[in-house]
């Protein structure tokens, strides 16, 4: 508190005293015979579910994730999801409506109808109502699976260390916006929008299927969608899905792809109006770091880890 008094901080002693940890209900969407689970706002996991719901409306099961059409539809769906994410998502207690409104079939169908299947488009948010990260996945012989993620944000967080403690303060307040009319406006007693999201999937019988995460700021929701498409819908081996070329939506029509992308695919996406930028994943580190544990039908597990950055799959 003495540190707080010495700095221009919005939080008050009452905010700290009234803070609570919530046991939340996961957001869920049926997908590829199972379901994908994400934490509700104030995180970005809902963008994965929005994009997957839009893709189902587009008949994505007909297109391989590496095909031009599969990539085109996936990119457009994620652009729509990110537009809604930026406009609406905040601490759910301060959102204009319940987060589930963004996942209704009626709304997702209306969003999917905006996609031109032959050409890239610019999207804005819709109207669902009328009016620095570490990831850990673990599983045991009993079938229990855990998906866990944590981050101080932006390196060592705020750069502020509480005197005489060695405790560095995180920097997630950076996720607030300064527009007082925005649902994610800076204020005390309020959680900021943030990017850290552990992913989870269930099979068609409601049993744990996959615990997964893709570290990397705004790449996380995009990476979750790409993992779900490859592993759940197209049956790819989890390690093959992690190693496959990734893409990420930046802004407007700009899409960054890894340099391992097929040249003909890049050319075809550009012909559809996507502004493609090629980056080396081993130099730019902007495509996230994935970790996956997948439960096989007989109860065994397949663990897969990232090749682009530090990561390890262990059996103990």
Predicted ranges, named:
Residues 6, 214-236:
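Alpha-helical support elements that line or immediately flank enzyme active sites
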């Amino acid at each position: 508190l003495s540190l707080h008094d010495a700095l221009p901080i919005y939080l008050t002693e009452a905010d700290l005293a009234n803070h609570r940890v919530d046991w939340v209900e996961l957001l869920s969407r049926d997908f590829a015979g199972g379901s994908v689970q994400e934490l509700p706002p104030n995180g970005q996991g809902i963008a994965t579910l929005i994009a997957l719901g839009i893709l189902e409306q587009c008949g994505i099961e007909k297109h391989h994730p590496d095909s031009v059409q599969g990539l085109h539809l996936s990119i457009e769906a994620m652009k729509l999801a990110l537009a809604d994410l930026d406009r609406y998502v905040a601490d759910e207690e301060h959102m204009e409506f319940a987060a589930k409104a963004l996942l209704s079939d009626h709304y997702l169908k209306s969003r999917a109808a905006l996609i031109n299947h032959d050409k890239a488009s610019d999207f804005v948010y819709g109207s669902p109502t009328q009016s620095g990260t570490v990831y850990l996945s673990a599983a045991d012989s009993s079938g229990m699976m855990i998906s866990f993620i944590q981050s101080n944000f932006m390196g060592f967080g705020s750069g502020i260390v509480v005197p005489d403690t060695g405790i560095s303060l995180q920097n997630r307040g950076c996720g607030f916006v300064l527009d007082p009319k925005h649902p994610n406006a800076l204020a005390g007693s309020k959680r900021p929008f943030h990017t850290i999201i552990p992913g989870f999937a269930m099979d068609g019988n409601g049993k744990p299927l996959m615990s997964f995460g893709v570290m990397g700021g705004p790449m996380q929701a995009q990476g979750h969608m790409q993992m779900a498409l490859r592993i759940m819908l197209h049956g790819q081996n989890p390690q093959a899905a992690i190693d496959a070329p990734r893409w990420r939506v930046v802004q407007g029509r700009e899409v960054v792809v890894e340099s391992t992308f097929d040249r003909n695919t890049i050319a075809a996406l550009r012909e559809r109006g996507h502004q493609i930028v090629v980056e080396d994943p081993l130099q730019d580190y902007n495509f996230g770091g994935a970790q996956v544990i997948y439960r096989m039908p007989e109860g065994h597990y397949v663990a897969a880890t990232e090749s682009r950055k530090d990561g390890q799959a262990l059996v103990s």
